[in-house]
Structure formats: C-alpha cells, structure tokens
Amino acid sequence: MRAMRLVEIGKPLKLEDIPIPKPKGSQVLIKIEAAGVCHSDVHMRQGRFGNLRIVEDLGVKLPVTLGHEIAGRIEEVGDEVVGYSKGDLVAVNPWEGEGNCYYCRIGEEHLCDSPRWLGINYDGAYAEYVLVPHYKYLYKLRRLSAVEAAPLTCSGVTTYRAVRKASLDPSKTLVVIGAGGGLGTMAIQIAKAVSGATIIGVDVREEALEAAKRAGADYVINASSQDPVSEIRRITQGKGADAVIDLNNSEKTLSIYPYVLAKQGKYVMVGLFGADLKYHAPLITLNEVQFIGSLVGNQSDFLGIMSLAEAGKVKPMVTKTMKLEEANEAIDNLENFKAVGRQVLVP
C-alpha cells in the first residue's frame, strides 16, 4: 500500500510502498477514507515538540507513517473483535493505551505509560490502510461522513477536553487563542454548544477571524493590529476572562494572555510551540488563577465529541481536501500559517 512516512527528521515525508498489515486478536484493519492534517504533524516532521526531541526524548522510532485523525471503513477484523464487521464506517480514537498501567485503569488512556498513539509511535493514517490495536477505540458513524469525522478524532477530542477543563457556564467569558484554525474553530463551537459562554476569538489574520465568527465567536480581536489586552478588558468591562484556551503556547502568547485572566481564571494550555511560561508567582496566589495542561483526550472525551457531532451540534470546518501525496504541502501550509480550518487527505 502507499504510505507517506517520516523517514528522516527535518525532511519531507517520503511516499513508500509498504505491506498491508494483517489484524489479529482485538485488532482492526481500516481502509482510510479521510485523514486530517494536524499541527502536531508539523512538530513530528521537525523532529521536536519544543525542546523535546521525538526520537531521543520521546522514543519515536523511524520510519513511521504519520496521520492521527482517522476515519474509514473496516476492511478486516481480528478473531477477538465483537460488534464490528467489514464495511462499517468508523472514526478512530488514535490516543490508545496498552490497558494495564495506572492511567489506563483510571480511564486516562491517553496518558498511558506505554502509549499506542497512531501516527506518532505507531503507523498512522497517511496511507491506504491503518491497523488499529483495539476495536474499543472505534466509533460507528451514522450521520457524519469520513471527511467530517476525521478531524474530530484530534482537533475535536483535544478541544472538547480543553473546554471541559475551562469550567464554563453562560455567565463566563472564554478567550480562544488561535481561534481561526482547525482547533480554534472547533473549540468555539464546542464551548457554545455545551456552555453558552461568551467567546472572544483571537488571531492575527482577517480570514482566520472570519472563520472564528462563522464558528460562533461573539467577538474577535486581530492581535496584529489591536491591543488584545485592552480589548479583552473592554469587552469584559474590566473583569478579564474567566478562561483562556491557548492553542499556541508560544513565547508571545504566554507573555500576554495570562495577564487577561479574571480572578479565579483558568489558563488551559494546549499548544506545543515550546515556549517557557514566565509569570509573576504572587499573582497566582493573590488572584487564585490556575494554569492547566490539557493533552488530547481520553476515551470518554472521544465518545463525547463524536456524540455531539453526530447530533449536529458541532461540525468540523474542513476547508480543503487533498490527495495523500500532497501531505507535505498540507503540512507546509500549517507550518507557514496559511491554513484556515482543517485540511483533510483523501487517499
């Protein structure tokens, strides 16, 4: 089968012909119909998440097939699989655990000590087929197409969990940093659907701000031409934001947006740009603010976002479908901040 693989750090993905895997036991072979392109794939190709090197520090073994936003049809199942059969259209939770560690036992499989992350340390969906380690990580699609569903498995899961951690309600104000991208537009939709909070979207390009508006943002701020701190203070009548979801965590965002938090505000950190957080420690105590890490999501988050999307309450803003062989172009678009919404590869 054709697969776009990371063979060498810092180099374009390479199209290779590799064997189609054979499922056994609880495994399922999926014929890919859609693979979303995530900013994590930029970091994978660069070979690092901030200062963490994917090979030396995170144990990723090359070559590996990228792509962790996955939807397709079941091609073949192992002999221990129940409830699924050939032809079923499914979305795949790529954040899988081995099942035995402490974190797996408490339902936080995505934090597994020996994770099985498709497209990271297991071969992923930038291919014609992908082998899923366990059928429990599948979700049967009823209303959604594969192209609509694929981005939900990362951008949807990630922002669903981040919104949960933001502890929102209709009285609260949420600021979304990076509001016009795939994660940003998803975060806005989810927050509106589950909380009714007032949402301020921040980005640096007008087309991204338009995407944030379409997703449901009540206010948008162009951080390249406006003072975001004063604008957020104005919108909130001086109170500040009850929560910030930072989808970048860059040096610039972390130097600005922690200071827009209201008392008891929550700063939910999602992005992996690799900057250091520098914040005047007494303010944490005096204002009772919290800095919260949020990494993708667990199986409960996966089922939650899929149910929400199947009910029509959120919809991925897929702006472009591309061929499998165009994976490098799609990653380039993300790396150079040219992508709006979500790009999806269709093998």
Swiss-Prot record:
Keywords assigned by UniProt, alphabetized: Metal-binding, Methylation, NAD, Oxidoreductase, Zinc
Quaternary structure, from the entry: Homodimer and homotetramer.
Cofactors demanded by this protein: Zn(2+)
Example of a GO MF term: alcohol dehydrogenase (NAD+) activity
Key word Cell inner membrane present: no
Disulfide bridges in this chain: none
Gene coding for it: adh
A Gene Ontology cellular-component term: cytoplasm
Binding site for Zn(2+) 1: 38, 68, 154
Known EC number: 1.1.1.1
Group of enzyme by EC: oxidoreductase
Organism: Sulfurisphaera tokodaii (strain DSM 16993 / JCM 10545 / NBRC 100140 / 7) (Sulfolobus tokodaii)
Protein family membership: Belongs to the zinc-containing alcohol dehydrogenase family.
The protein's name: NAD-dependent alcohol dehydrogenase
A Pfam family of this chain: ADH_zinc_N
Cofactor binding summary note: Binds 2 Zn(2+) ions per subunit.
Location of N6-methyllysine modifications: 11, 213
Keyword Metal-binding among record annotations: yes
InterPro entries: ADH-like_C, ADH-like_N, ADH_Zn_CS, GroES-like_sf, NAD(P)-bd_dom_sf, PKS_ER
Catalysed conversion reaction: a primary alcohol + NAD(+) = an aldehyde + NADH + H(+); a secondary alcohol + NAD(+) = a ketone + NADH + H(+)
